[in-house]
């Protein structure tokens, strides 16, 4: 594997170490989902300690559906831009890793070269509207996680891996089966090198608590309107919480509200609720001074 310049690798490793420290800290890590550079800048300004990329939000903002619809090259380019804009760790949403084990290695190397702290790697397959249709075989996903470890070793990288499990989405009709599979995979992924185990479609306090107790790694969930509060999640033992494309949804919802007001009333009073030009300019000016 082609080496990465030492100064680039050192900078990436510094952010990877920081992200790992934050996930292992006593206080739960809250990671908002950036869908463009401006949202990443805003999150850093507001005091978030790390930022998550949202594949669904980024794809939608570019006019694509979720699910590796954008190329690896574009994904890496955008992830690098997000990372360069902020000083806090940025974790990319690597979806399924862009290919088999060799593809995963290429993705990891490209992200490290872009200075990115880490990535999500998911085990859902057979996309359908709203999520995965099935889980990839455990052995196949373990090969991908091992590929991440091998790439890190070859590069001298401390890249962070957030291993995502889609069991609760795929097995929504059988929560007991989903929980058993979620625990089994969580421990297997952690043993193979996952730094954090990330679950979707789980909101039950009882289930979240069991995951935190029975999976031998830091645990994270994707939060939604049904989820417990951040304080409750910390009390349940979670290490991390993220929000996927929630902020893109909020932004496009605000755009629709203003557009509807113009069409129906010919006014723009709801614009008062938005961020004003001086605030936006202050964000991007700070970025361009760094």
Task: Mark where each language-model region is.
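Extended, intrinsically disordered, low-complexity segments
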Residues: 1-12, 19, 246-290
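Alpha/beta enzyme core
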Residues: 2-243, 250-257
């Amino acid at each position: 594997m082609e080496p990465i310049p030492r100064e680039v690798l050192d900078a990436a490793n510094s952010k990877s170490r920081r992200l790992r420290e934050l996930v292992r800290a006593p206080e739960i890590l809250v990671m908002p989902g950036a869908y463009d550079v401006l949202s990443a800048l805003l999150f850093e300004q507001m005091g978030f300690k790390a930022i998550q990329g949202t594949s669904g939000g980024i794809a939608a903002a570019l006019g694509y559906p979720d699910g590796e619809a954008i190329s690896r090259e574009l994904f890496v380019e955008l992830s690098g831009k997000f990372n360069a804009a902020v000083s806090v760790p940025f974790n990319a949403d690597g979806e399924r890793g862009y290919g088999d084990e060799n593809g995963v290695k290429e993705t990891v190397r490209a992200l490290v070269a872009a200075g990115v702290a880490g990535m999500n790697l998911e085990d859902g397959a057979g996309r359908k509207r709203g999520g995965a249709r099935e889980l990839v075989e455990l052995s196949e996903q373990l090969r991908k996680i091992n590929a991440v470890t091998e790439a890190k070793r070859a590069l001298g990288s401390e890249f962070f891996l957030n291993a995502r499990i889609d069991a609760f989405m795929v097995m929504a009709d059988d929560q007991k089966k989903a929980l058993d599979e979620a625990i089994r995979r969580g421990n297997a992924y952690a043993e193979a090198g996952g730094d954090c185990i990330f679950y979707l479609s789980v909101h039950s306090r009882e289930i979240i608590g069991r995951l935190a107790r029975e999976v031998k790694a830091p645990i994270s969930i994707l939060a939604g309107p049904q989820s417990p509060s951040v304080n409750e999640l910390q009390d349940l033992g979670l290490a991390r919480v993220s929000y996927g494309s929630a902020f893109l949804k909020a932004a496009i919802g605000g755009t629709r509200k203003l557009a509807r007001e113009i069409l129906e009333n010919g006014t723009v009073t709801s614009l008062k609720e938005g961020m004003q030009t001086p605030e936006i300019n202050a964000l991007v000016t700070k970025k361009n001074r760094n």
